[in-house]
Amino acid sequence: MEGLLAQLCGTDAARPLPLWEGDTTGHCFTQLVLSALPHALLAVLSACHLGTPRTTNHSPALNPGWRLRLAASFLLSIFPLLDLLPVVLPPGSRPGPLWLEVLAGCVTAVAWFTHSLALWALVHSPHGRSRGPLALALAAFLPTPALVLTLLWHCQRGTFLPPLLPGPLGRVCLLILQLAAVLAYGLGWAAPGGPQEPWTHDPFLSSESQETEVAEDGESWLSRFSYAWLAPLLARGVRGELQQPRDTCRLPRRLHPAFLARVFQAHWKEGAQLWRALYRAFGCCYLALGLLKMVGTMLGFSGPLLLSLLVGFLEEGQEPLSHGLLYVLGLAGGTVISAVLQNQYGYEVRKVTLQARVAVLSTLYRKALKLGPSRPPTGEVLNLLGTDSERLLNFAGSFHEAWGLPLQLAITLYLLYQQVGMAFLAGLVLALLLVPVNKVIATRIMASNQEMLRHKDARVKLMTELLSGIRVIKFFRWEQALGDRVKACRTKELGRLRVIKYLDAACVYLWAALPVVICITIFITYVLMGHQLTATKVFTALALVRMLILPLNNFPWVINGLLESKVSLDRIQRFLDLPSYSPEAYYSPDPPAEPSTALELHEALFSWDPIGASQKTFISHLQVKKGMLVGIVGKVGCGKSSLLAAITGELHRLCGWVAVSELSKGFGLATQEPWIQCATIRDNILFGKTFDAQLYREVLEACALNDDLSILPAGDQTEVGEKGVTLSGGQRARIALARAVYQEKALYLLDDPLAAVDADVANHLLHRCILGVLSHTTRLLCTHRTEYLERADVVLLMEAGQLVRTGPPSEILPLVQAVPTAWAEKEQVATSGQSPSVCDLERTTEEELEVEQSTCGCLVQEESKSEGAVALHVYRAYWRAMGSGLAAAILVSLLLMQATRNGADWWLAHWLSQLKAGRNGSREDPASCSPGSTALFSPRLLLFSPGNLYTPLLSTPLHKAASNGTADVHFYLIVYATIAGVNSLCTLLRAVLFAAGALQAAASLHHRLLHRLLMAPVTFYDSTPSGRVLNRFSSDVACVDDSLPFLLNILLANSVGLLGLLAVLGSGLPWLLLLLPPLSFVYYSVQGYYRASFRELRRLGSLTWSPLYSHLADTLAGLPVLRAAGATYRFEEENQRLLELNQRCQFASYATMQWLDIRLQLMGAAVVSAIAGIALVQHQQGLANPGLVGLVLSYALSLTGLLSGLVSSFTQTEAMMVSVERLEEYSCDVPQEPHSQPLQSPHQQRISWLTQGSVEFQDVVLVYRPGLPNALDGVTFRVEPGEKLGIVGRTGSGKSSLFLVLFRLLEPNAGRVLLDNVDTSQLELAELRSQLAVIPQEPFLFSGTIRENLDPQGLHEDRALWQALEQCHLSEVAVAMGGLDGELGERGQNLSLGQRQLLCLARALLTDAKILCIDEATASVDQKTDQLLQQTICKRFANKTVLTIAHRLNTILNSDRVLVLQAGRVVELDSPSALRNQPHSLFQQLLQSSQQGAHSGPSGC
C-alpha cells in the first residue's frame, strides 16, 4: 500500500502521504482525502436522489435559487474536465503528479455531474417547492476547503512568478472559477423557497388525518435505505397510538388498490391465465430485483473468503500488519454492503408481493360479482380469499431463491474445492444423494396439501352454514351432531397436516444434521488422502459448509413454497374460469319489438345447472306489457322463483331468447329470502342512492315501516345486525321491498313479499305500494296468497317448471285449487258467522328486535383488539395446548442438539491445536509473503484466478503421507464422529417431537374454540358478525396450523444457537464478553422499540381481514339483488376501501420488519468487525490461538444473521401468537349458556322425565338489556297435557320470547318455567331441549344429504324418514333427487324455499317430544298444501302439547285455547269461540282487522 501511494503521489515510500508540506497541507493528502473522498460522498448521495418520484402536477416553474444551483453544478462538472488538459503537456509543465490529478479531476467531474442530475430530479419532485434535502446541500460544500488549500499550494509553489507556464497558470484560473461557482451555488441554496407540498396520491380515505400519516413517496433515497421515514409511525407505536388502520402509514401510490386495480386490469381479460397477467403487470419490476439478489449473494461470500485469509494471517504470522487490517476492513465492508443489498431486495420483493396481492384479491372479488348460477360454496370462496391468495403470493419469495440457491451452491462448492481439493466430492455426493429423497418428500407434501385444502374448504363451508343456522341448531340440540361433522372435517384436515408435518420434520432432520455429517465426510476423506489439516482449511471449510447447508436447507422449503403456490394458483384459476354472468350474452341485444312491451321471452329454456339433473324452466312465450301487474302462482317447487331468476339472468339460458326494455336501468328485485346488510335501516333502504327526503317518506309509508321505526331504539338509524338478525321476518321483507322501491326502476320482480306479514300489512303493501307507488311500473308478483291477485292484469300458472296457462285472474285463480277466494269467503262468513280462513298476523321476533341494541341503535360493536405485548397467559395457553411434557421434551432435545453441535466444533478446534503443537514448523502452503513485504494486496486475495482451479489437484499427493503429526488421527476422528452421531440423533428427536407438538396444539386449540362457540348463547351471535368468527376458523387456525410452528421452530433454533455461539465466543475471545452488556442493551432497546409497533400492526392486520371476509360473504349472499340494482361498482369500491385498510397494515408491517433488519444487520457487521479487530490485537500480542480464534470467527460470521434472525423470528412469532391470542379470546371470554356441560351423545341421554307435557309460566319477566322495556312482564299461564294453545299478539307483544324462554335460549330475569312441574332452570340444556320440538318459520338446511338434514343425529331408520317425507308431500322430490342420499347443496339451495320449509316440518314429524312449538312454518307453501299439512300436524301430534304462534289465524282457530299477548303481558286466555264472542276483546279486534285487511282496501285504490 505504501509503495502504491508513493507512486501515485510522487513521494518517498517512507512517507507516501505527508500531511504537511511546508506551511500548508500536503498536496496528495488534499487531493485524495480532502477532495476525492468528499466528492465521492457527494456522488453517492446525489445518486440516491436520482430516482426521486415526480409530482403528479405539472412541472413547477424554476425559482432563481434552483436555476443558480443547476447552472453552478453543471459548470463545476465541466471545470475539472478542462483541468485534465495538462495531461497532454510535457512533463515539465504539469502542475502536479499526473495520475493524482487525473484521479482527482475525474472524481470531481463525475460527482458534480451526478449532482446536476439529482438537482434536476428534485426540481420536479415535491422538494421543488423547498431547498431540497439539507444533507445533499451540506455534501456539496464539503469539498470547498480542498479548493482553497489547492489554491494556497499553488501560491506556495510560485505559480504566479515568472516564467509563467500555461499548465499551472490555467489551473489556478480554473480553481478561481470553481470557487466562484461554489459561491454561486451557496447563494442559490440560500435563496428562499416555497413551502413543501405534500405528496399526492389516489385518496380513498378522504377523512383521514394528514398530521398522523407518514409516507414513503417523496422521501430521499438515504431515508429509504435507512427507513427513517418510518420514525413517526414507530413513535406512535411506542406511545400506544396505533389503534386503528388509519393510524398507520399512508400507502405509496404504487401500492394503492385503486391504482393497482387499473394497472392490472390493463393486462387482464376474462378467461386469461392469471400468472400471465401478473407477469405482464409486475413481472419486469420483479425480475429486475434478481440482479440485486445476485449482487447481494455474491457479496455474501466475502465473509468466508476473508475469514480464510484472516485465519491464515493469524496462523502463519508472516504477513505484514497492513494485510490483516485490510482483511478486517474488507470483512466489515463486505458484510455492510451485502446487508444493505439483501435488505433492499427483501423490501422490494415484499412490495411487489403486496402489489400482486391486491391484484389477486381485487380480481377474486370482481369475479365473485360476476359468478353465474353454478357458483362454488361460500366457504370455498372465502378460502380462496384468505389461504390460497397468501400461498400463491409466496411465489414471489421463492422464485428468486429457486435460481439463487443453486448459484450459491455452485460458488460454495468451488470455494470448498479450493480449500480441500477433491475431498469435497465426498460431501457433495452425500448431499446429492438427498436430492431424490427430497423429490419424493416434495411430491408427497404437494399431494397432501391438495387434500388438506379440500378438507379445509369443507370445514369452513360447514362453519359458515352452522353460523347462519345457530338458532335452529340450539332449538334442536344439534350442537353435538354438527360439531361432530366439523370435527370430522378437522380430523381429515389434521390427518393430511400430520403427513405434511412429519415430512417437514424429515426435511428438517436431514438438512440440520447434514452440516456435521458433510464435515466429517470431508475431513476424513481429506486426512485419508494424506493431507494435513490446518486451522485455515478447517474453519474456512466449516464456514463454507454452513453456507452450503443454507441453500440445501432452504431448497426444500423453496420447492415446497413453489408447489403450494402452484396448487393455489390452480384453485384460483379454476374459480376465475367459472362461467360469468354476462348480460350482453344472456339478453337479446335488441329490445322487444313492440315499444309497449316491457319483457318478452320466447322458446326459452333455463336451468340452475346446465349439465346436472336439476329441474328445467321452459317458457314457450311470455310477453308483458309496460305498466302491467302480473301474478305468478303454482304449487311449491313449480318454478315461480326460477322464472324471476331467469328474468334477472341468474339461471343458465340453454336456448331461446330474453328481451327486456330499458335493461340498462336494471330491475327492482325483492327476493323470497330477504337479503339485509349489516347496516342501519336507512342505509339498507337507500342502498347507495342519494337521500331524497320526499321519496324516502313515500317509500316508508308505502312499505308500512313507520310504525316499526317508531318503536325501534334509534328509528331508521338502528343497526339491524348481520343478515338483519334484529328484525322480524316481516320487517326484513318490507325493508327489502322498500330498498327495491327506492331505486325507482321500470321493472319490478317481487317474490312473495306478502308471505311474512299479517293481513293488515299485506293489504297495505298491496294498495299503497304495489298498486300505489309502483302503479306506473311493470310488476311481476309471485305469491301463494291468491286473494291478493284479483287486481292483477294477468296471472301466470306454473307447473313442473313450465308456464302452462296465462290469463286474467277470473280464469286462472279457480284452477289453483286454493282456499276459497275472498268473495267466497265473504259469503261463508256471512252464512256461518265464522272468521275468515285466511287471516294474517305478522310475527315479530322481539328478542331479535331488542337484543344488544343501545339507545343509539348500535348493535354490532367494533372488534376488540388487545394492546401491548402478547400476554404471558397466551404463551401458557399454547404450552398447555401442546402438552407440558411434550413441550419440555422439545426444549431438552433442542439444548442437547446445540450442545453436541458445539461439542463437535470444540473437539475439532482442540484437535487442530494439538496438530499445531505437534508440527515441526513446516507449512503445507508454500505461497506466503515474507514478513518484510510491503505489498498492498495479498496474492491470496486472487481466489478466482484460473491458476487456483488446478492448485488443489496439483497439491494432491499420489501416495498417503507418512504421518499426520503426533496426534492420534483415528482417535480424534472417532470421537468427532461419535459426537456428530449423537447430534444427529438429537436433531431427529427434536424434529419429530416438534412436529408432534405442533399437531397437538393445532388440534387442541381448534377443539376448544369450536366447543366454546357451540356453547355460546344466541345473543353472542346476534352481536358478532360471522366474518369475525370465520376469520378465526380460517386465517387464525391456518396460522396456528402452519405459520406459527414454522416461526416458533426457527425462534427456538436461533435461541439455542445464540447460547452456543456465546459460549464459543466467551471461550475463544474472553475480552469479547465485555461487549455483551452494551450490545445486549442496544439489541433489547431496538427490538423493544420495534415490537411495540409491529405487534399492533399485526393485530390491526388481523382485524382488517374480518371486514373483507364479511363483505365477500355478504356480497355472495346478495348477489342477485345487487346485480339487479346495478350496484356492483359501488360494492367493488367498498371492497377496495376495505382492501386499502388491510394493505396499509400489511405495508406498515413489512416496512417495520425491514427497518429492524437493516439495523440488526449493521450492528451485526459492527460486532463481526470488532471480533476480527480483537483477534488481530491478540495476534499482535502473541495471545491468539489460531484454532480457537478460527472457531470464534467462523461462528462470528453467523452472528449477524443469527441475531437478526432471533429478533425477527421472535417478533414474527409474537405476531403469529396474536392468532393464538384471538383464538383464546373466544375460547375463554365468549359467554356460555348456563349449566353448559359436555355434550352427550343422543344415545346416552337419560330416560325421559317428561311424560305428560304440561307447560307452566309463573311470573316470568324477561329483559334483554338494562334500560330496555320488559319483553315479558309477569307472564303467567298454564297449558295442560295434550292441549293445543294458539299464541297471538301484535308486533312486539312477546310471542317469540315465550319460545326462547321455554327453550332457555334466553334466561328469564324473574319467575320460572315448569314442565310437568319440573323447574327448567334446574335441568341441563341438552336434556331440556331433547324433550321439546320446534318448527321454525325460517328453514335451516346445511350441505349434505336429505338423510343428514332430516336426522343429523342418526336416530331413525330409513322407513321412518320416508314416512315423514310422504306426510310432507316431499317423497316425489326426494326420489327425483336420488333418494335419501340426494345432495341438497349449500343451505339447501337445490330446493325451493317452500320445499325447504316442508323438509323442516318433516324433521318435527320424526320427533317423540311431548311438546311441539310451531312458529308458523307454512307461509311459503301454496294453500292446498298448507291445508294438508295442517291436517298432518293435527293427526301426528293429536296427543302432544302444541304451542302455535299464529301467523295466519286459520292455523289456530281449531286450538283448544288462545293466548293473547300485549306489551309482554297476558291479556286474554280462553277458547277461540269464547274470545271471538267477547265484546271489545283484543282477539276480536285482531280478527276484525284481519277480515278488513283481507277483503277491503283504502278507498280510491
Curated annotation (Swiss-Prot):
Phosphothreonine sites (modified residues): 464
A GO BP entry: leukotriene metabolic process
Gene: Abcc10
Stretches that traverse the bilayer: 32-52, 70-90, 102-122, 133-153, 172-192, 294-314, 321-341, 392-412, 415-435, 508-528, 539-559, 877-897, 969-989, 1033-1053, 1056-1076, 1158-1178, 1187-1207
Boundaries of every ABC transporter domain copy: 599-825, 1255-1488
Major localisation: membrane
Subcellular location(s) per record: Cell membrane; Basolateral cell membrane; Basal cell membrane
Highest taxon in the source lineage: Eukaryota
Source organism of the structure: Mus musculus
Keywords: ATP-binding, Cell membrane, Lipid transport, Membrane, Nucleotide-binding, Phosphoprotein, Repeat, Translocase, Transmembrane, Transmembrane helix, Transport
Similarity comment: Belongs to the ABC transporter superfamily. ABCC family. Conjugate transporter (TC 3.A.1.208) subfamily.
Protein's membrane topology: Multi-pass membrane protein
Protein name from the UniProt record: ATP-binding cassette sub-family C member 10
Domain annotation ABC transmembrane type-1: ranges: 286-564, 887-1215
Role of this protein: ATP-dependent transporter of the ATP-binding cassette (ABC) family that actively extrudes physiological compounds, and xenobiotics from cells. Lipophilic anion transporter that mediates ATP-dependent transport of glucuronide conjugates such as estradiol-17-beta-o-glucuronide and GSH conjugates such as leukotriene C4 (LTC4). Does not transport glycocholic acid, taurocholic acid, MTX, folic acid, cAMP, or cGMP. May contribute to regulate the transport of organic compounds in testes across the blood-testis-barrier.
